[in-house]
Amino acid sequence: MTAQNENAQAQAEQVEVANEAQLEQTAEIQQEQPVEAELAAAYARINELETYVAEADNREKDIQLRAQAEIQNIRRRAEQDVEKAHKFALEKFSKELLTVVDNLERGLNALDTAVTDEKTQALVDGVEMTHKEFISTLAKFGVEAVGVVGEAFNPEVHEAISMQPAEGIEANHISVVLQKGYTLQGRVLRPAMVMVAG
């Protein structure tokens, strides 16, 4: 029986060693599982934070680009406002000068019929030179006359007083200019008052 006891005891020891080894493996696995779970949670949190940082960077870049675009728009608008102010600063002054031009032209028309001698002709020539110089000076500052007989009617720069048939002039073209119109840098100062061929 001793050999059997020894065998039984050896088997019991082997079973006990196997049980201990199995318990150690189970303990190691149980220890590794919480570590792996914590590690997986930590990696998930890291990924989440990296995504948040990337989105924050994108938001910051977007805000910066929008701010730069807004600054450029404000700068461009300010430049346009200054340009318009320079361009049209003379508008009121130019409108007042148009009355002077009209009166000079009326005076010239009246003098043309009243010329009787050389002295009167010299006066007419002087007034004509003054008129031409005045028109030239206005043109230097962007004031241009509009409304010529035979020109196509344009409601943006012409004001039609009436329509009537006219020989040698196409329909919807100016037949008579009652008062010249003027523009300043392309903007209408005063529309031309005209009669249109019908």
Curated annotation (Swiss-Prot):
GO cellular component: cytosol
GO biological process terms, semicolon-separated: protein folding
Principal subcellular localisation of the protein: cytoplasm
Keyword Cytoplasm: yes
Keywords in alphabetical order: Chaperone, Cytoplasm, Stress response
Subcellular location: Cytoplasm
Domain of life of the organism encoding this protein: Bacteria
InterPro entries reported for this sequence: GrpE (IPR000740), GrpE_coiled_coil (IPR013805), GrpE_head (IPR009012)
Signal sequence, start to end: none
Gene3D superfamilies: 3.90.20.20, Head domain of nucleotide exchange factor GrpE
GO molecular function, one term: adenyl-nucleotide exchange factor activity
KW Hydrolase (keyword) present: no
Subunit structure: Homodimer.
Protein family: Belongs to the GrpE family.
HAMAP family the UniProt entry points to: GrpE
Role of this protein: Participates actively in the response to hyperosmotic and heat shock by preventing the aggregation of stress-denatured proteins, in association with DnaK and GrpE. It is the nucleotide exchange factor for DnaK and may function as a thermosensor. Unfolded proteins bind initially to DnaJ; upon interaction with the DnaJ-bound protein, DnaK hydrolyzes its bound ATP, resulting in the formation of a stable complex. GrpE releases ADP from DnaK; ATP binding to DnaK triggers the release of the substrate protein, thus completing the reaction cycle.
Official protein name in the record: Protein GrpE
Organism this protein belongs to: Actinobacillus pleuropneumoniae serotype 5b (strain L20)
